[in-house]
Amino acid sequence: PSILHTRGLVFAQRDMDVVLQAARSNQPFGVLTGLMPSGRMHLGHTMVIEQAKWYQSHGADVSVAVADLESLATRGVSLDKGRKIALEQYVSNYAAMGLDPDKTQVYFQSTRPEVQRLGFRLGRRTNLSELGAIYGFEGDTNLAHVQAPLVQVGDIVHPMLDEYGGIRPIVVPVGVDQDPHIRLTRDIVSKTPVSYTHLTLPTKSS
């Protein structure tokens, strides 16, 4: 285990046994993490990348989502400014921290239509009441902000599309404050018998 595990900074998980089994048997598995391009990199980002590096050292491929659409929707950061912040404040530092460029994909939500389409289709499995209860949306919340969590669901699921590596376990290291979103994503996927290109999202019975 990494120092983050041994010191108790990583203290919760779901289905980690599936990931560890993949690593031990040299089977494919991946990591999906992201960044909001609206400010400077901080210690929390560093700990997430240290986790990603640890998984990568055990065979994982890493996908890094630049949440430029979410930054635009929730914080009013233009796509051009978000791109500049991401490249100067985050991506360059991630490379300096030692992520293997041959096993790392960095992408922008705004330029990966598969993510947007997945978010749209998976959005049929939730509703405004549920999103409002989780995220506190109210009548004056702009609709781009409401859509942002569904784009994040697309971020998490899309590495399992054939063109991005196919079906395999995906680890999503997040802070405990993000757990409601992870639970939402798992719930949506578990009840979505939807074929998307060659990816069939599992139902609860599968």
Give residue spans per PLM region.
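Alpha-helix N-cap and loop-to-helix initiation/capping positions
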Residues: G44-M47, S78-I85
